Structure formats: structure tokens, C-alpha cells
């Protein structure tokens, strides 16, 4: 799969050819996770509506839920104003985090609301 050249031209990638992907739950607005994508992962996501990311540690693409069953059905993809981050709005099935938690941001609260 190849990325539309018009979209590819707008992306700003790091030295490894990657850009950040923030994944948000449709309906609740909760941020579920942050991962990396390359052009091919974004192209696959846009074509299949299955969230596909790039693993820096394994050096390969992975489809969310392919092994765990914790899938992400993509409803929309937005590019930020700088072109270096995409926002995926998804329906999450199961946990988004590799720990099994619904979101990767349940672990530690560093600063809470003013009381």
C-alpha cells in the first residue's frame, strides 16, 4: 500500500521516517495511547480502517489487536497543524494498552485538578 502523495507531502517525519500517532476513543474523547507510524502504516490505516502502527523496537508495522484481539476501528484521521502528528479517532475493543488497561494513561497521575 502506498500513501497518497498529497498526504505524504504534508507529513513531517523524524530522522527514522516516523511521526507520532495519538489515538483517541470516539464518544468519550479519552486519549488511549500514543504510538508511531510510517507512511505505509498510515496508508494501511486509511485504506482498511484498522489502526496500524510502526514498532520502533521490532522495526516493523503492527495492526492493533492482530494478536490480542483488542482492536481499534478507525473512524477519522486528522493531521495536526505542524504535520508531525496524526490523531486517530477509534472504537476500542478491549484494552488499548499493552498492560491490558483501557488506556495507557491510567498508570500515574503527576498533577491533578486544583482542589
Curated annotation (Swiss-Prot):
<dbReference type="GO" id="GO:0000105">
    <property type="term" value="P:L-histidine biosynthetic process"/>
</dbReference>
<feature type="binding site">
    <location>
        <position position="97"/>
    </location>
    <ligand>
        <name>Zn(2+)</name>
    </ligand>
</feature>
<keyword id="KW-0028">Amino-acid biosynthesis</keyword>
<keyword id="KW-0378">Hydrolase</keyword>
<dbReference type="GO" id="GO:0000287">
    <property type="term" value="F:magnesium ion binding"/>
</dbReference>
<feature type="binding site">
    <location>
        <position position="81"/>
    </location>
    <ligand>
        <name>Zn(2+)</name>
    </ligand>
</feature>
<feature type="binding site">
    <location>
        <position position="84"/>
    </location>
    <ligand>
        <name>Mg(2+)</name>
    </ligand>
</feature>
<protein>
    <recommendedName>
        <fullName>Phosphoribosyl-AMP cyclohydrolase</fullName>
        <ecNumber>3.5.4.19</ecNumber>
    </recommendedName>
</protein>
<comment type="similarity">
    <text>Belongs to the PRA-CH family.</text>
</comment>
<comment type="pathway">
    <text>Amino-acid biosynthesis; L-histidine biosynthesis; L-histidine from 5-phospho-alpha-D-ribose 1-diphosphate: step 3/9.</text>
</comment>
<feature type="binding site">
    <location>
        <position position="82"/>
    </location>
    <ligand>
        <name>Mg(2+)</name>
    </ligand>
</feature>
<dbReference type="Pfam" id="PF01502">
    <property type="entry name" value="PRA-CH"/>
</dbReference>
<keyword id="KW-0963">Cytoplasm</keyword>
<dbReference type="InterPro" id="IPR026660">
    <property type="entry name" value="PRA-CH"/>
</dbReference>
<keyword id="KW-0460">Magnesium</keyword>
<dbReference type="GO" id="GO:0004635">
    <property type="term" value="F:phosphoribosyl-AMP cyclohydrolase activity"/>
</dbReference>
<comment type="subunit">
    <text>Homodimer.</text>
</comment>
<keyword id="KW-0479">Metal-binding</keyword>
<feature type="binding site">
    <location>
        <position position="104"/>
    </location>
    <ligand>
        <name>Zn(2+)</name>
    </ligand>
</feature>
<comment type="function">
    <text>Catalyzes the hydrolysis of the adenine ring of phosphoribosyl-AMP.</text>
</comment>
<dbReference type="InterPro" id="IPR002496">
    <property type="entry name" value="PRib_AMP_CycHydrolase_dom"/>
</dbReference>
<feature type="binding site">
    <location>
        <position position="80"/>
    </location>
    <ligand>
        <name>Mg(2+)</name>
    </ligand>
</feature>
<dbReference type="GO" id="GO:0005737">
    <property type="term" value="C:cytoplasm"/>
</dbReference>
<keyword id="KW-0862">Zinc</keyword>
<dbReference type="InterPro" id="IPR038019">
    <property type="entry name" value="PRib_AMP_CycHydrolase_sf"/>
</dbReference>
<dbReference type="GO" id="GO:0008270">
    <property type="term" value="F:zinc ion binding"/>
</dbReference>
<keyword id="KW-0368">Histidine biosynthesis</keyword>
